[in-house]
Amino acid sequence: MKGTGLNNFPQFGVMEGVKILVCGGAIAGPFGATLLGEIGAEVVHFESPKNPDSVRGHYGYSQNHRNQLSMVADMKTPEGLEIFKKLIKWTDIFIESSKGGTYEKMGLTDEVLWEINPRLAIVHVSGFGQTGVPEYIDRASYDAVGQAFSGYMSFNGTPKEAMKVSPYLSDYVTALNTCWTALAAYVHVLRTGKGESVDVAQYESLARILDTRPMEYFTDGKEFPRTGNKDTQAALFSFYTCKDGGEIFIGMNGYGPVRRGYPLIGLPKPGDGDPEIDEILSGWMADTDLGRRLEAAMEKFVSEHTVDEVEKIMLENQIPCLKVYTLKDCAKDPHWKARDIFVEWDDPMMGRVKGLGIINKWKNNPGEIKWGAPLFGENNEEVLKDLGYTEEEIEDFAKRGITASFDFDQTYEIYKLEELFPHYREGFTERWKKEEE
């Protein structure tokens, strides 16, 4: 927000007073800082005047950079590097996302940063990590690269085609990993007084949630063919298409659901005298003759009922299930409304917008959206003043291109915003009218 600097961040939330400097663009690094900023952390997003965040001009930037300040300076100049170092001295946690080894090549090793701030928690986020095979370390990465290299993509899709999980699973899982590792490093600093550095690799973040599949591969040599939405292990634990085309997930597994659920789909309960089904305790393997018999019974049942009918019948009998929601369904659902997931906030480019709010409900110290994503370099002046620079120095930095800030017409030209978001100019104009008043 215009007028906010390092010394007047709003005070709220469980992360109140914790300072975070984040360098890098897109999702994997900055989004973790955003989550902490929404519960009170003081976040400054540091960008290059020649290489702005690649998601600026898109909805993702608006939602994923709330409660942040924007500082833009060229670290390749002595003055810009000095600004960066002063921010390192100010901050508690430094998060950077770039190709592995980038900061080391710039001469900004962890040891150099700790000379400036011995109590600094550092998180390096990259596609392939800071160590390992050099030709991998130096590669750029996108979400789909992380999904492919982690092996995650190989489990999703059909036998004919692998499929990436949308939207941007690898990026967001890495951001969540970044978030908790930053906090763990910070706790270590608080406990010991000594800095810590963490190397977060995008592909490893996703590999860590491959469930037991790596263990099964290395222990038993098991391989996992792609089967679409059908569970490869348990029968009656999958997605089904109903009479009206509606889709629903049903999980008829566990001692209770098996006994309550089988009669609903025309099967006897275990113990009723069917020699095959009497063997079942809490479920059965999918790829067996009995598993195929169970699936055939369910397919027949859903083909005779609409998705709403199936959901009602299953829920009345305490069978875990839910039809596949669209965002339209989410927006209308009373439970979503009751928990205030969708909220409005003011965006400097678009005006009043609506999207996802703050997840996790804090009883005593709730999170808040104080302002929308900042404009490019919007807080340069305030941040530089709080770092001790004079007005003359700040003006000189801008004139020489060491710092840069938002230029509306230039931004339109770069991002073709009129094509993407026709309401941008109107929202921007309204915002600055209010500020001038």
From Swiss-Prot:
GO terms under biological process: bile acid biosynthetic process
Listed name of the protein: Bile acid CoA-transferase BaiK
Catalytic activity entry: deoxycholoyl-CoA + cholate = choloyl-CoA + deoxycholate; allodeoxycholoyl-CoA + cholate = allodeoxycholate + choloyl-CoA; allocholate + deoxycholoyl-CoA = allocholoyl-CoA + deoxycholate; allocholate + allodeoxycholoyl-CoA = allocholoyl-CoA + allodeoxycholate
Keyword set includes Transport: no
Record-stated family: Belongs to the CoA-transferase III family.
GO molecular function, one term: bile-acid-CoA transferase activity
InterPro entries per UniProt: CoA-transferase_III (IPR050509), CoA-Trfase_fam_III (IPR003673), CoA-Trfase_III_dom3_sf (IPR044855), CoA-Trfase_III_dom_1_sf (IPR023606)
Active-site residues annotated for this sequence: 171
Function (record text): Functions in the bile acid 7alpha-dehydroxylation pathway, which forms secondary bile acids via the 7alpha-dehydroxylation of primary bile acids, and is carried out by intestinal anaerobic bacteria. Acts as a bile acid CoA transferase with broad bile acid substrate specificity. Catalyzes the transfer of the CoA moiety of secondary bile acid-CoA compounds to primary bile acids. Can use deoxycholoyl-CoA and allodeoxycholoyl-CoA as bile acid CoA donors and cholate, allocholate and ursodeoxycholate as bile acid CoA acceptors. Shows no activity when lithocholoyl-CoA is used as the CoA donor.
Pathway named in the protein's UniProt entry: Lipid metabolism; bile acid biosynthesis
Enzyme class: transferase
Top-level taxon: Bacteria
